[in-house]
């Protein structure tokens, strides 16, 4: 395993023998009971001045490049900068053409994870942000999210998926192309899933919002914002111990300081 010389934080990348992992940092935000994501600059902003109960999180999809695929793990908030999707810009800064993304793996459909999956055209229609890619989502998560709606979900950002010809609706747990293992976990929301990417002896693990930050892996607590907080706690403990024993590389979507951790 080789670690490249550090790049600016948001574009840090690690190169493995067969796998390159790039955190695509969209920035730090606070979120409270309103479910709104407010930009937060650690250098100038004071968390104590935000609404009571505000959580400080990073929004951080991941690009995983293997010998077979260019994978995108979740898609961020869907913000635009200079009329271009922020996630497209971040992928280009990593030296990759967004059109080369072959698979979009969605852990669940909360807005901070799926809003970059599509983009709105001038006529108001929404199309796939990665038209060459196959999108993967749990079928019951899509059905549940559309039924549940706001504020937990924003169907406007993902309803287009239903009519997408290159959408694969997953059921339960299974395997994609013999090396991407998806696991239906529930926990954070009823039909949340996580991904294990295993190739040539390397094992990258993306726990979505069941395992969003490294510090949560090291302590036992039940989060009020989870659908089943106890299940999330138990899964984190299980993965953390197993991952350390087996040498997993953990990808943390909401971690400000540690987007990637490995032994």
Question: Where do the model's predicted regions map?
Answer:
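Pre-active-site segment of Zn-dependent metallo-hydrolases
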Residues: 39-61, 65-103
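Core dinuclear metal-dependent hydrolase active-site scaffold
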Residues: 18-26, 60-65, 71, 172-200
């Amino acid at each position: 395993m080789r670690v490249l010389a550090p790049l600016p934080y948001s574009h840090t990348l690690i190169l493995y023998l067969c796998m390159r992992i790039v955190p695509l940092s969209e920035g730090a935000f606070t979120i409270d009971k309103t479910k709104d994501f407010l930009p937060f600059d650690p250098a100038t902003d004071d968390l104590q001045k935000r609404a009571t109960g505000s959580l400080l999180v990073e929004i951080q999809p991941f690009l995983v490049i293997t010998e077979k695929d260019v994978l995108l793990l979740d898609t961020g908030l869907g913000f635009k900068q200079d009329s271009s999707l922020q996630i497209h810009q971040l992928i280009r800064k990593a030296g990759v053409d967004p059109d080369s993304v072959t698979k979009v793996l969605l852990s669940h459909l909360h807005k901070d994870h799926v809003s970059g999956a599509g983009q709105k055209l001038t006529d108001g229609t929404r199309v796939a942000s990665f038209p060459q890619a196959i999108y993967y989502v749990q079928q019951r998560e899509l059905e549940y999210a559309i039924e549940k709606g706001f504020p937990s979900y924003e169907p406007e950002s993902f309803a287009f998926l239903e009519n997408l010809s290159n959408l694969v609706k997953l059921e339960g747990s299974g395997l994609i192309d013999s090396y991407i293992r998806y696991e239906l976990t529930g926990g954070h929301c009823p039909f949340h899933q996580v991904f294990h990417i295993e190739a040539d002896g390397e094992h990258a693990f993306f726990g979505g919002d069941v395992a969003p930050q490294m510090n949560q892996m090291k302590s036992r607590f039940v989060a009020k914002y989870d659908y089943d907080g106890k299940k999330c706690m138990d899964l984190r403990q299980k993965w953390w111990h197993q991952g350390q024993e087996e040498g997993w590389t953990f990808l943390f979507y909401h971690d400000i300081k540690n987007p990637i951790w490995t032994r």
